[in-house]
């Protein structure tokens, strides 16, 4: 059932980025997703704040309707990071073995990844480099 959803809407740049971490550093897919998701949420938040607000309201934060977009993004990202920390997931791309000198190669591969077109916001190679760097 999840696959049907993926094929209808795409997966976006979280998966474009984590596929590279798995391929290059043998990082488990779920761990890589947990590391990359908060950074990409901040990036996509510029065009997804209303969706984030709706999710926050539905997970018990009715006050989210009164928050400005930046506070919605920050609150949602914080919730995701807290969950990740609570279950003991590593928090940085550095923990996968990634080094600064690898970022351009990872970004090139992420640009070519089939999941990229499903992202709600356009992304460039430079964006990918910056996103990986922010996740370090």
Task: Label every PLM stretch briefly.
Residues 99-136:
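Short, amphipathic C-terminal "tail helix"
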């Amino acid at each position: 059932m999840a696959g049907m959803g993926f094929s209808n809407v795409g997966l976006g740049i979280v998966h474009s980025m984590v596929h590279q971490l798995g391929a290059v550093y043998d990082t488990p897919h779920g761990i890589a997703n947990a590391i990359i998701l908060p950074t990409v949420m901040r990036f996509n938040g510029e065009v997804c704040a209303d969706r984030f607000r709706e999710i926050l309201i539905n997970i018990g934060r009715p006050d989210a309707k009164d928050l400005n977009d930046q506070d919605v993004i920050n609150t949602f990202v914080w919730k995701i990071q807290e969950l990740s920390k609570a279950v003991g997931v590593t928090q940085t791309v550095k923990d996968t073995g990634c080094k600064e000198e690898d970022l351009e190669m990872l970004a090139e591969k992420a640009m070519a990844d089939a999941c990229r077109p499903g992202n709600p916001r356009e992304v460039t190679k430079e964006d990918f480099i910056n996103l990986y760097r922010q996740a370090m």
